[in-house]
């Protein structure tokens, strides 16, 4: 009919990250459920994968996590406490732990047992189903109530040791220094 079509949606760049070494965008941005004018992005721009808070115009407001460790996964959001639940290896490279990070960048560990933790967050963000293992302990599943100042943990399952009754090797984890004596 001769009427020019107007696009229903317009697109524009929200944020652009460049590096002369390497950029690998692996994780989508996540808008805060309690404030749709802000989003969280994971980036390795400081050498480690960390969380950054941005406004809706793409302006960086704050680096929420920092240090010589890696945010491995953004598990979800606790809307009541306005915090982000993450899995990270902050304490030790072999221990994947669960943390709550508030908008000031303050972190609180949500469980106290060493191991590799994998968690699912409830829709309300108040409960975690935390499944973890260690080389010497079979699978454990806990329900963690993170709505309190100190998380409350209830055991849901502790698997029987499938190797009970067998002679087992001794498991040890350690570090070996490189030629520079540091790493």
Whereabouts are the PLM-identified features?
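Non-catalytic accessory segments flanking enzyme active sites
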Residues: 1, 9-20, 24-28, 72-76, ...
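Beta-strand C-termini and the immediately following turn/loop, strongest in propeller blades
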Residues: 1, 29-47, 55, 65, ...
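Short, flexible loop/turn elements at secondary-structure junctions
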Residues: 18, 43, 58, 68, ...
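A short loop-to-beta-strand structural motif that recurs across blades of beta-propeller domains
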Residues: 50-52, 97-99, 140-142
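Short loop/turn segments that connect beta-strands within beta-propeller blades
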Residues: 55-59, 102-105, 146-148
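A generic "binding-loop/recognition-motif" signal
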Residues: 47, 57, 70, 115
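Polyanionic (Asp/Glu-rich) segments that form extended negatively charged tracts
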Residues: 13, 50-66
